[in-house]
Regions:
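Iron-sulfur cluster-binding electron-transfer modules in prokaryotic oxidoreductases
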Residues: 1-173
Length: 175
């Protein structure tokens, strides 16, 4: 991790605190612009999506076009983990190529940001399918919101609990 790395600012922006997000974006972008790396990899599709979809806009709203351009550079060099594994490293069989083994029954719910903003497609599920001894069961309505992402569950706890309950019931039925 580069020294000085901080939050991507997504929580600030999604909560409506765009002005408060500007110094966070500035610190994040400057930290990564001066770091020596070819690619940054994050396990969170939400954070990666924030870099390309929110940080340049936050910089522009603060009147800093140079920061917006730098944010776009940082975003172009940042990948979600499954993008690194499949697109860069060419992993197509996690069991054979990575020695991944998990003798359990699981289901998979794709993240909204991965599915909608990063358009990861089936990368993550395809990788899971190749883990040795895994029993991957389909999750009905997997493309629907889980109701728990980001600050949604904090702002809308009743809706989130209801959606989460539906997802848990679906997971239990199919695994």
């Amino acid at each position: 991790f580069p020294p000085g790395q901080v939050c991507c600012s997504q929580m600030h922006v999604n909560s409506g605190y765009v002005e408060d997000a500007l110094p966070v974006v500035r610190n994040h972008v400057r930290t990564f612009m001066k770091a020596d790396y070819d690619l940054a990899v994050a396990p969170s599709a939400s954070c990666v999506a924030s870099l390309g979809h929110q940080q340049p806009d936050v910089a522009r709203s603060g009147g800093d076009e140079g920061l917006a351009r730098d944010a776009e550079v940082v975003a172009s060099r940042t990948l979600e983990l499954s993008q690194l594994l499949t697109d860069v490293l060419g992993v197509t069989d996690a069991g054979a190529q990575l020695g991944s083994w998990f003798p359990h029954t699981v289901t998979y719910h794709p993240s909204c940001h991965g599915m909608r903003l990063l358009r990861l497609g089936s990368r993550q599920e395809d990788l899971l399918r190749t883990v040795a001894d895994i029993d991957l069961r389909p999750l009905p309505d997997a493309e629907e919101c889980c109701g728990f992402g980001g600050t949604f569950s904090l702002k809308n706890p009743d809706v989130s609990a209801h959606r989460g309950g539906e997802d848990r019931e679906g997971c239990l039925l199919y695994t």
